[in-house]
A protein has these predicted regions:
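Compact nucleic-acid interaction/catalytic patches
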Residues: 17-20, 26-60
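C-terminal terminal-subdomain/extension
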Residues: 62-114
Length: 114
């Protein structure tokens, strides 16, 4: 089971010119015979203009325990991609129940924006 796991994956920059290994949150378990996983980008650069679907994880918060994240971070639920599980470099940790529930509540917000 991989859902709610924070992993390291090669993630493309906005212009797709280069990739960088970054943390991501697995939003699903493996899908289909090719074991694809839907992931959301995690950044340590917390923008001033957060959007409704962003989830902040503070380093000093109990929500950080077990995630493997070492700095304040933001889960960017509007930056999602489907990848083969084989691209996952390694597991960092797992989000707690609170973050998992927040993710489920906020995941549809980018699609509901009118």
């Amino acid at each position: 089971m991989i859902k709610n796991t924070i992993v390291l994956v090669p993630f493309p920059f906005d212009d797709f010119s280069v990739t960088k290994v970054r943390p991501a949150l697995c939003l699903t378990n493996e899908i289909g015979k090719y074991n694809h996983v839907i992931i959301a980008f995690i950044s340590s650069k917390i923008p001033d203009d957060l959007i409704e679907s962003d989830i902040i994880i503070k380093k000093q918060s109990e929500n950080t325990i077990g995630t493997g994240l070492t700095v304040d971070s933001v889960i960017r639920l509007h930056k999602i991609v489907t990848i083969p599980k084989s691209l996952i470099k390694r597991k960092l940790g797992t989000v707690n129940k609170f973050i998992a529930i927040e993710t489920r509540k906020k995941i549809s917000q980018p699609f509901d924006n009118e």
